[in-house]
Amino acid sequence: MVIETWKKSGIATKFPTYRNSAPVTVHSWQKGKRQDVEAEGLWRIKDGIYDFTEFIDKHPGGTFWIRETKGTDITEAFEAHHLTTAPEKMIAKYKVRDAYQRIYTLTLHEDGFYKTLKERVREKLKTIDKRPKRKSDVSDDL
């Protein structure tokens, strides 16, 4: 049943390895993900393979997540957690090579919905006052 539902979803071109075997654990999910994405023990973002080994201890979000996702496709997480364009520019120096086509059919085209939304949010955030709230200048004289 799970596989049939998945086929109709169109999310990926291949059913994730170990996803339908009991018990499904974080470790079995990661093992299957590592096997499916062919990241060769490195990290995949979009159509590139990256070696973040030297960056692990410098990652502003801490080391845990980077270490745990080694060997997997982190595209969606990378996009969701990095609103500015700085991280995308920074990772270029860690790129090892181009990757094969992703098994996931979710797209992140520059002119697509997600990237357009992200750009609009980025622009809107520039207009928001980031200073601490000021106490009211108005006081009641009782």
UniProtKB/Swiss-Prot annotation:
GO terms for molecular function: heme binding; metal ion binding. It comes from Drosophila virilis. It comes from the Eukaryota. One of its GO terms (cellular component) is mitochondrion. The gene is Cyt-b5-r. Disulfide bonds: none annotated. Keywords: Heme, Iron, Metal-binding. Belongs to the cytochrome b5 family. This is Cytochrome b5-related protein. May play a role in muscle cell metabolism. Residues 16-100 form the Cytochrome b5 heme-binding domain. Heme binds at H59, H82.
